[in-house]
Amino acid sequence: MERNDSLKRVLSCLADRNLGGALTELRNFFALYSQPQAEAELEPLLAEYQMMSNYWKRGYKDPQLEANFNRLLQRTCQLYADTSRWRRIMASPFMSTVYSSLAQQPREWSVANIRQELEAYVSDVAMVSLEPANKQKTHLQELNTRHLKSMSQLFDYLWTSRHWSDATAQAFEEMLLSPTVDATDQQLMISAMTLSLLNTFDMAKFRVLVHVYRQALVEAVRQRALVGWVMGRSYTMTIVFPEEQQLVNEMMEDEAIRRELLELQIQFLYTVNAESDTAKIQSEIMPDLLKNNHFRITRNGVEEVEEDSLEDILHPEADEERMERVEESFRKMIDMQKEGSDIYFGGFSQMKRFPFFHRMCNWFMPFSMTHPEVTETLSTIQHNRFLQQVLRKGPFCNSDKYSFVFAFSQVLERMPQSMRDLMEQGEAAIEVVDDEESVTPTYVRRMYLQDLYRFFRLFAHTSQFDHPFKTGESELGQVLFFASPLFRNTKLELYYDKLGTMLLRRKRYEDLRTLMKNQGESHRTYSYYMLAATAIRNTKEPMDSKVRLEGILENYRNALNLNPFAEKAMQGEARILLEMERYEEAIATYDHLIAINPDKQSYVLNRAVCLESLERYEEALKPLFRLNYEQPDDVNVSRVLAWTLLGVGKYEQALTLYEKLTTVEQAAAEDFLNQGYCMWLTGNVQGAIESFRHYIKETGEPAINIINNEERMLSKKGISNEEMQMMYDAIAP
């Protein structure tokens, strides 16, 4: 999507409420790219700003200054939006072709005329139903063909439209809520408005979508409006149009809306995973289905096809095992779909090259068997019971149903007769969606999101639009709309914990941190602080290690302020204190943890690590001996005990443990290192050299670190600097 540096500077000024700067940058832009109509709109804005500025400079106190300034700022923003739109149209062959085609139409684009045409269509359809049966089909086809052409033009007009006046917005809102306008037409208009908002924010269109969402009685219309205002929300213009924030704040007082937004956010996450889900199906599920394809699918499920009996004699259990694997593969896919995965994207993405999808509005068209561009195709196959079942009850989005019609018509004649008979009789089994579920808000919204995702991923000219499903390598970006500043300090934050838990389960730590950073202090709960600590610990954001650890510790302590006896938070605090080498504080926390759960081995062991780090070896030995007695084969206990024994000078006992640790399968390199120290202190220099070399070979650690890391301990144990240098010379590669 084309962007212009001059217009970026205008946008930056507007985001800073720098009205004078925005007007100046617009004037500079028009000096480079002449646009007479827009320049004519700029002149009165410049004049009004100059007049306002002159009065202010003379010391006049205008009680209307703030209101006038804000109105002028909004008008300037609208001019910027229209100019940005014009610039994109001129820079895009696709958009300029659409725009030129609309300009050549003799059609009047007034709202009154549009509404009259839409209502006339509904009336005409009703009249056709009163005609003789032998005429109805032809007349309805002619009527639908004209209407499709009209709606296609209206769709293009809306997504390329300028900003709306309040009067225009009000008229469109009434049209979108009117029972005298066909719901399919209303849905198409909302989709076109969404595309327009994605390219350039328009407060009037945003307001219309919010109002339609809150007032529409047709669920499909309502859900498209919801998706539309969420996708089309502004990231920068709230400071210019505070009404946007006011509308959002009002909605966030409604618990039902908050719940619906949480559902939508989760559905967004599943939607953008369509391609990874496809990859999972192809790599993990389809191989089993293809490998075990000695079955057919009927209305009764998976049934066996007769095979050569020799295999049955040699391997009587093989068929049953194959059946189980096939059924398990199907269950995996069904489970993925029930969770919200778009499991059909991979297959249907190959079916979007039909001429039907050259018409842009068809990507958003609710499925209808009377669509004039599918009626001819359906005329020869519409009585196929399998097809009827797919189109009426199949779990497919509208776009995929249209794809299925065209693909099915091409392959039907090439199918084996036995398979065609099965389909004609309606015995080929597919997963069906019951009527009750198909009209639920959740299902309606999911299908629409799949339609949108297919458009933005597969439409030939999708680069002309801001991609609402675009994600980074490790971040969801704008897909994570819960992290939008619009929702900060609103009651939507009451649902951040639920979403955060889901992000945590999916190991989306960067996104979890982004979400947590957006949450205001008033709604921060125990769960918030625990999630925030986990996010910081697992993100790769470059920051000073000490600052990072302090941030984690602060979150754990904030969690404990809200729930002083929370073992998880206390455990996190102790672990971070240990990592920060604040051993005294860590010991105090582990004392509390052991009081809560005295049988938890990790608490006792980590407390002992703190004690030995403080060189309080004797104090650490007693609990370590107990643990070693109870768990003689636990390598972690043996490892800590061995180092503690080394600390108190009981080298032989330590060596016994290190001998055991270094002879187990897949011995840890660290144990060879510590064994080397122990051997050195007992005078077995050659053994120490061999252990150190083994450690260096395994880890690539510089030889000098072996000396430097434990220089203090070695000196206290009587190893001289000269001996240390000689050891370095002996082990250095």
What are the residue ranges of the model-derived segments?
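Alpha-solenoid helical-repeat scaffolds
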Residues: 365-568, 572-575
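Short coil turns that delineate tetratricopeptide repeat
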Residues: 34, 523-524, 564, 598, ...
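Start-of-helix register in tetratricopeptide repeats
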Residues: 224, 494, 527, 568, ...
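Structural motif corresponding to the intra-repeat A-B loop/turn of tetratricopeptide repeats
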Residues: 16, 506, 539-540, 546, ...
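Canonical positions in the second alpha-helix
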Residues: 518-519, 558-559, 592-593, 626-627, ...
